[in-house]
Amino acid sequence: MITSAAGIISLLDEEEPQLKEFALHKLNAVVNDFWAEISESVDKIEVLYEDEGFRSRQFAALVASKVFYHLGAFEESLNYALGAGDLFNVNDNSEYVETIIAKCIDHYTKQCVENADLPEGEKKPIDQRLEGIVNKMFQRCLDDHKYKQAIGIALETRRLDVFEKTILESNDVPGMLAYSLKLCMSLMQNKQFRNKVLRVLVKIYMNLEKPDFINVCQCLIFLDDPQAVSDILEKLVKEDNLLMAYQICFDLYESASQQFLSSVIQNLRTVGTPIASVPGSTNTGTVPGSEKDSDPMETEEKTASAVAGKTPDASPEPKDQTLKMIKILSGEMAIELHLQFLIRNNNTDLMILKNTKDAVRNSVCHTATVIANSFMHCGTTSDQFLRDNLEWLARATNWAKFTATASLGVIHKGHEKEALQLMATYLPKDTSPGSAYQEGGGLYALGLIHANHGGDIIDYLLNQLKNASNDIVRHGGSLGLGLAAMGTARQDVYDLLKTNLYQDDAVTGEAAGLALGLVMLGSKNAQAIEDMVGYAQETQHEKILRGLAVGIALVMYGRMEEADALIESLCRDKDPILRRSGMYTVAMAYCGSGNNKAIRRLLHVAVSDVNDDVRRAAVESLGFILFRTPEQCPSVVSLLSESYNPHVRYGAAMALGICCAGTGNKEAINLLEPMTNDPVNYVRQGALIASALIMIQQTEITCPKVNQFRQLYSKVINDKHDDVMAKFGAILAQGILDAGGHNVTISLQSRTGHTHMPSVVGVLVFTQFWFWFPLSHFLSLAYTPTCVIGLNKDLKMPKVQYKSNCKPSTFAYPAPLEVPKEKEKEKVSTAVLSITAKAKKKEKEKEKKEEEKMEVDEAEKKEEKEKKKEPEPNFQLLDNPARVMPAQLKVLSMTETCRYQPFKPLSIGGIIILKDTSEDVEELVEPVAAHGPKIEEEEQEPEPPEPFEYIDD
């Protein structure tokens, strides 16, 4: 056994090259044991490597590399490993090889990423030897079937060629595509590179044996390529694959922005008829109404002459199909279907509201109860509670009246067809001026009904805002207009709101500043930013500044690194409200990206800024960035939740609520629990609201603490000595927990994994209730119906059942509160004589004997009852449209005997097109009527009598 390498090292000084080679081979064998000794002579080994004439210089490099590895000098070790060429065996499982490969990949990745950001002429050449090792690694991954590893490294090193090759060579191409798409959505932080990856994915999806159009369109939404989506839809219609086209349209509406959808609609409209065989005949630009009618006629004539044998009666069909697709893309269909689902399945427990109403004693809690009622009935059109308590409701005055009127917009969310009739009583009239608070609230309500789906109502609100003579009406009008025109970037709307902002009126300006951001949502419009930031730096009104702070952030929604320059300048501003705007801008620009740089910035501000509002906003913003990985949030904010600063604690609570909304995350709830007993009342308020955001729609089985929190809300509300702020939080929490008749959840991403824009905006503006209660209503934008709605080829709901393969109690509605029984008045005990006492004693003994005879029968009956209660089925059949919670989707399937087949997996949920495999007549689900005032009935007057001749006697 060798105890020293000195003898071998001395051979390196020999003249004979063979002896040196022999020494190197021996050293290579013992280097792991004697590296310390060899390191003293490593310069000799280096000299051998540098000697061009030495035959085994690669071997010298390998030995030198191993010595430097043991010394911890990884960079030198990597350089010599590269010099060793093929002698460095990437397939070896030693710690040395693993470490050097990791360093090699890191070094290569760094060079590739640096090169990617440089223009073509300035790119630095990459060491071919380095690339060689990385290529060997890729091959090793493919040989070992470690495809996910290869995809990960390929994306990190920006090697799209390897990325594509890996997917195509894998044994599960659809699985690898889904994995890659998920990586793109959640982990990729560079927008330009992400787009290149998506282009590759689109190419692979399209080249599959059976092209996966649904996923292609998901990629195209990310790429912001509406033209390609329109082309796919046209292609599907031409190929008579209508059901697939409808399914894609529903998915697009759920995931894409309004601008994207309107471009697709525009392209579909300007195509004439999809049958036209002339390639490239798509005319762009808006076609005026008169020409539109004549246009298709020309194309029909052309096709008739060009394509012989085409039947003329086939031409109107595609037009009808295109109209249906436009109806779906515009959101009209989805909104109608969700409204039907929410009305049909409304399961609100009015007892909760009644108890709260009886317990509240001041105007703040009165407003909170009105808001909670609107949350509980969001989209159900049921204003039963308000009708039953008109006298109580009438106590709302001034801005409370504004909030109460606007709450009708939340209750009737999506009830667009009768919106103007429903709200007629509250809207501004030409004849007599009504209450300004009521009219402003009415306009705000119209915006809430049509949020992110304005259509014709935008022009109505535009005119109302133009003609408004009162700052309160202008406030409501601006909010309503901002909501209805959300993300449209319409210039006329922007100009009118800007005019209202420049009037320098605090009340109008606050709403106008926020509305400007809503209209320009995610547009990154330089002019809008310049106008808004410029005015924010000039104005003296804090209210206007507050509105603009959120508005500026909204303009940068989803823009990621493109917003960095603006964020930098806002964060350096001396005005704390603009610094707060910087925090919101980080939240909006990087929402859902999990970007480390953004998180670091927010955490730094959270502990270093001198202003409490800025620190609170910074911590809240963490929730928006981390919502794709809610399990990470508790560890990020756990220390902040114990901060000495109550504003930071409040921010931590809200961040947990935003990030883990609807998940029932146990760690988050464990962090919030002690905060519900915080010595500072507004921290308790935040903890109560956040707990409801997390536990919305959770049951005792999915989240054991839900009932404990329900009781806590009730305790806080009914405690006469508790603080108003905590009570406000508890009342709102009750409303959030049972929102939408127990049929909605809150989720910041769509079912397909895209960031859900209305939800993000709704939650951000909701957090501003800290300054302005009426903004609480914005949370209704984030409510997503938890449903599976199956549709047939005519886009009607057929009668069909889904099978939920778990016990019904797992996802059941919570049991309603019991009406407390009235206590009987205690009777005063009367004096009893000794004789009567004896007589009663005898009677009792008689009864006892009789009871003993009866006992056996009754005991048997009791046992029977218990037996009946015991067995709970392991599955449940749900009727279409079905309430299916996100966690329940995994166990959902069609029944075995079902005649319908879904076009995409039921586990995704939402609106699903069903293919009918039977020729029998379909049974359809009857639509239900919406609630609310029925104005039409009142307007029907009796017909005038028949004309007759009046003869005077």
Curated annotation (Swiss-Prot):
Disordered: annotated span: 277-319, 839-881, 930-953
Q: Could you name the Gene Ontology cellular component terms for this entry?
A: proteasome accessory complex; proteasome complex
**UniProt feature, compositional bias: Acidic residues:** 936-953
Q: A GO molecular-function term, please? A: enzyme regulator activity
Q: What does this protein do?
A: Component of the 26S proteasome, a multiprotein complex involved in the ATP-dependent degradation of ubiquitinated proteins. This complex plays a key role in the maintenance of protein homeostasis by removing misfolded or damaged proteins, which could impair cellular functions, and by removing proteins whose functions are no longer required. Therefore, the proteasome participates in numerous cellular processes, including cell cycle progression, apoptosis, or DNA damage repair.
> Which regions are annotated as PC repeats?
403-436, 441-474, 476-510, 511-545, 547-580, 581-616, 617-649, 651-685, 686-726, 729-761
Look up and give the organism this protein is from. Mus musculus (Mouse)
> Superkingdom of this entry's organism?
Eukaryota
Name listed for the protein in its UniProt record: 26S proteasome non-ATPase regulatory subunit 1
Identify residues that carry Phosphothreonine.
Answer: T273, T311, T830
Which family does the record claim for this protein? Belongs to the proteasome subunit S1 family.
